[in-house]
Amino acid sequence: MNDNVPGAAPSYCMHNFKAAAAQNAERHEQGKAFVPPKYTFRGFEALPEDPANPDPDKFYGFVFQDTDFSKWIEAVGYSLTHHPDAELEATADAAIDIVCAAQLDNGYLDTYYILNGMDRHFTNLKDHHELYCFGHLVEGAVAYYEATGKRKLLDAACRFADYIDSRFGTEEGRLHGYPGHEIAEMALVKLAAVTGETRYSDLAEYFVWQRGQQPLYFCLLYTSPSPRDLS
């Protein structure tokens, strides 16, 4: 996770969370004067020109790079359940602090769009893995909570879930979409089980049953008179 493993390609995952956390701090300090980035990125992966000196304000890696943390923290949770390790837990807590500092006030937490431009979030559900990243974050948060009883990451996952729940559904004015890559559905069921909040399982049910409904959501996005940018 620290990008210092000899011979291994850097992940840039924690770099991205730190950059998003710094931007978030700047947003809070400047208030209404803060000018958010506008989405101009083109491509599925971004790498620094000089790997030894990445720009501290930019996103690097694949669009789903956040999941490196999520899968790691899930593994940490399972490990701590069977093999308590104070040092590993402290390392995980420090990483969680960084991740949670990147979360926007509305609950959104995906560094690809936070750093590249929130004006395009939820516009490419098919390819850009936002709900996939969300699902892995939830599964990691649940595993870590069940192992340690610590709620910080779980609460962040709930806030992200609440934001998604406010944006998606069959009602007019909501997005009628669903994940391009499934995992959010079963993650939401786990979140409902651990929190007792049935709205999360209801959201999972919506995603399951909305997929395949005619007209197909992704086809509409590709064929509409003003299709969204697919890059």
Which residue stretches match the model-derived regions?
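Single conserved hydrophobic/aromatic residue that forms the stacking wall/gate
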Residues: 222-231
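Acidic/His metal-coordination segments adjacent to aromatic residues that form catalytic metal sites
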Residues: 118-124
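Glycine-rich active-site/cofactor-binding loop and its immediate structural neighborhood
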Residues: 124-140
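Hydrophobic core segments within long, regular secondary-structure runs in both alpha-
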Residues: 73, 89-103, 135-138, 142, ...
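Low-complexity, Ser/Thr/Pro/Gly-enriched N-terminal "stalk/linker" regions
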Residues: 1-68, 93-113
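Well-ordered alpha-helical scaffold segments within catalytic/enzyme domains
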Residues: 73-86, 135-150, 184-197
